[in-house]
């Protein structure tokens, strides 16, 4: 019973995905990533502007690659 329900959900999902991504009525699929990448406004993206914390500033739990400019955080940025 569970397998049948899972198969029905998978078929419905794949059918909906194909319908949403179809470019035209012939069923050709569009590469959404390539289209979106050249339409992006890189100046408006906040991901391009990485803000880091200077050494000696509290950064939280020890981790590598956190908000510190050096990439090392052991309660304070190193």
From Swiss-Prot:
Keyword terms, alphabetized: Calcium channel impairing toxin, Cleavage on pair of basic residues, Disulfide bond, Ion channel impairing toxin, Knottin, Neurotoxin, Presynaptic neurotoxin, Secreted, Signal, Toxin, Voltage-gated calcium channel impairing toxin
Localization (cell): Secreted
UniProt note on tissues of expression: Expressed by the venom duct.
Highest taxon listed in the record's lineage: Eukaryota
Pfam families associated with the record: Conotoxin (PF02950)
MF terms (GO), sorted A to Z: calcium channel regulator activity; ion channel inhibitor activity; toxin activity
Propeptide: 23-48
InterPro entries for this protein: Conotoxin, Conotoxin_omega-typ_CS
Leader sequence segment: 1-22
An example Gene Ontology CC term for this record: extracellular region
Cysteines engaged in disulfide bonds, as pairs: 52-69, 59-73, 68-77
Functional summary from the UniProt entry: Omega-conotoxins act at presynaptic membranes, they bind and block voltage-gated calcium channels (Cav).
Domain notes: The presence of a 'disulfide through disulfide knot' structurally defines this protein as a knottin. The cysteine framework is VI/VII (C-C-CC-C-C).
UniProt family annotation: Belongs to the conotoxin O1 superfamily.
Protein name in the entry: Omega-conotoxin-like ArMKLT1-011
Organism, as annotated: Conus arenatus
Lineage of origin: Eukaryota, Metazoa, Spiralia, Lophotrochozoa, Mollusca
């Amino acid at each position: 019973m569970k397998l049948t329900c899972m198969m029905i959900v998978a078929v419905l999902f794949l059918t909906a995905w194909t319908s949403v991504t179809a470019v035209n009525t012939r069923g050709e699929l569009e590469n959404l990533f390539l289209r979106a990448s050249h339409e992006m406004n890189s100046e408006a993206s906040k991901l391009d502007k990485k803000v880091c914390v200077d050494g000696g500033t509290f950064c939280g739990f020890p981790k590598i690659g956190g908000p510190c400019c050096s990439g090392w955080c052991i309660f304070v940025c190193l």
